[in-house]
Amino acid sequence: MPIQKPRPLATLALLALFTSQANAETARPTEPGDAGAYLAAQYASAENDFRAAVGLYDRALATDGQNATLLDGAILANIGIGDIAKAAKLAVAFEALGGKSQQSYLAIMAERAKAGDFAAILENTKNDPGVGALFNGLVKAWAELGNGDMTKALAGFDAVAATPGLESFGLFHKALALASAGDFEGAEVIFSAKKGTQLTLDRRGVLAFVQVLSQLERNPDALSLMDKTFGQVTEPAIVDLRRRLTAGEPIPFDVVRNSTDGIAEVFSTLGSALNGQAETNYVLLYARIANHLRPDNSDAVLLTAEQLEKLGQHDLAAEAYGAITPDDPSYYVAEIGRAATTRAAGRKEAAIEILQALARSHGDVLAVQNALGDGLRRDEHFAEAIKAYDTAVAMLGTPNSSHWSLFYSRGICNDQLKNWDLAESDFRMALKLEPDQPQVLNYLGYSFVDRGINLDEALGMIERAVAARPDEGFIVDSLAWALFRMGRFDEALAPMEKASLLEPVDAVVTDHLGDVYWSVGRKREADFQWRRALSFEPDEADATRIRHKLAVGLDAVIAEETAVPTPAAEATVAPVEPATDGN
């Protein structure tokens, strides 16, 4: 049973069950008393600067506390910073003025769930402002369970499951409800698809199934499920769970302990399902509330932080990641995320310090060493990066296709340190693991051309990379530059012009275009492109060479470099950043 995200079509069907993410209905807006604060709050909200927006809305509300427009904006801003309790108070005031919005509805729902006021939740679902049948159906079922009526709860989950496109959501939550009530046999029937419907479980769903099997004294089956799902993943939490199952330890069911947890799981389930499909702010709304109701659900914390990163709110994202404590199995994942968002905020040294500290506490985790290597490589500390990558490689055992980026990244470092033999070995290993990986094909092929070796193999590699990524400018540039370096100037022209269209403000690509124009006799155009390249602020070595070409022409520069090789004569390949795979 592989871990999967919802299929795009299924997610589109899910989205169709949600109405517009805008307010369904608000009270008649009135002119705010502090117009300056109101306008500034609106601007901050539009920029997703939730913290600034909260302060500005507070200021505006201090002079006009009965303004529904201000209240509704403040609700959303407070949810953005994670203050659900304050958002709920604002929501009560907003609805007292006749206002209705999804954020007010969800904030009030969250506080009632946290307080265990399930009767109020059942009453509240009658006033849905447009959240949708899926959310309300699941929440009502959990609230019925919280009220002590299992029959109505199960009927509610069944009603959701009977809705076209929602069967898996209804069945999954029904299984969780049964397990939370101690009916592990009933939960296992659903998880095992004994009634014909195979659920597609995410990581948390698989762990719930594992716990159910363990409670049924079926640890060997639980281990088999883990092997099938996670393979040889070295994640500490998975390793520890395997150890406990192997020792015969009964694993308690704690994914959902009560109805409040169940409602938290509704927010988490829908937030995860909508991630990447709905607007980021909308996903954040669900993730923040899931995190509020279940602070120990690290998946909800990570989902929250991910949305904040997407919105460019790196300080808030770092705070979210920082909420996961060192004793949590997801701590190392959170710290890697905190380092990434810290780096994105421009604090590169602080990001490296986070990773170095993590390597001291979790140095036996492959993903940690890989992340440290990546961070050091990006800051051009290549020798230190290689040490981290070496440590990661030593942990691999038998490498598989998911490890290609580790060898690719180490190869880049070796190349930058002029250790070409080691670099080539790493690149070839990356291709052995992932033969059609365009980033590796591009880098290795370009490097061969740059050195004047293995030219036929090099051109074939680059052509395969272009076939896989025809609209990636740097890879198309590699093809053109390879043809240029092989003296096939006319053939280089078309891909070089395409690369320039794809990367119109890149100094290296523009410089290359000038060289190709010069070589096919279009010297005025070459001069123009070289001057453009200078305007894009290339590094100093490239800038010096471009200025020399403008002064004496490309032929003279090449003649000089051929007579006395210099570092400036070497064309460089711009590596495409390997995808982060967490391995």
What is the predicted role of each segment?
Residues 59-62, 93-96, 130, 161-162, ...:
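Conserved structural position within tetratricopeptide repeats
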Residues 45, 79, 113, 145, ...:
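Position-specific recognition of the canonical hydrophobic site in helix A of tetratricopeptide repeat
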Residues 48, 82, 116, 148, ...:
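Residue-level detector of the short coil/turn that links helix A to helix B
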Residues 29-37, 64-71, 97-106, 128-139, ...:
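Generic helix N-cap/helix-start motif at coil->alpha-helix transitions
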